[in-house]
């Protein structure tokens, strides 16, 4: 952003996007103009807090925003649905490509609690979640309804890639 640009805090950045844009395309177009810069906080570790901002809309359009070395980087498209804390998003995508080419997605997946491994597992699992009523699972859902199956599937995905509270690498 230009010198002297307005500053907003890291914590208000998502709210700004939610309050001002109806679609991902609108948000991307406006944020590309870099009318402000996002001010981060310094954590107790002495490092600046980093954050990816991920948005999607009713059409399925998505975008991932992140600041890398002070510069806003935007990944825009329906394929950008998963993000973890680190590394930078371009590196997360490169790791995903490695696993696609290695054939690991259908045979084995990385299993550590590292963010990059969780990114690969989440991407794989999100791709295989049923988007329609699944005869395998529907009998175990309340009212045998997809409106219950879908959130149950998402919760099971989240639990399978989450790191237990208190666990440290």
Each language-model region and where it sits:
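A contiguous strand-loop segment
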Residues: 1-5, 33, 38
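Surface-exposed patches in mature extracellular/periplasmic domains of secreted proteins
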Residues: 28, 39-45
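Residues that act as N-cap/strand-start positions at coil-to-secondary-structure junctions
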Residues: 47-49
């Amino acid at each position: 952003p230009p010198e002297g640009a307005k500053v907003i805090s890291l914590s208000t950045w998502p709210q700004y996007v939610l309050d001002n844009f109806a679609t991902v395309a609108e948000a991307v177009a406006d944020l590309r103009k870099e009318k402000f810069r996002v001010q981060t906080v310094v954590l107790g570790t002495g490092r600046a807090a980093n954050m990816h901002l991920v948005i999607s809309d009713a059409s399925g359009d998505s975008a991932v925003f992140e600041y890398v070395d002070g510069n806003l980087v935007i990944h825009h498209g329906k394929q950008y649905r998963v993000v973890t804390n680190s590394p930078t998003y371009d590196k997360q995508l490169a790791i995903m490509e490695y696993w696609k080419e290695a054939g690991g997605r259908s045979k084995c997946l990385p299993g550590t609690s590292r963010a990059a491994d969780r990114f690969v597992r989440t991407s794989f699992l999100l791709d295989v979640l049923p988007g329609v009523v699944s005869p395998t699972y529907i009998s175990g859902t309340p009212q045998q309804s997809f409106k219950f199956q879908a959130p149950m599937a998402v919760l099971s995905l989240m639990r399978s890639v989450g790191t237990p509270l208190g666990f440290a690498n």
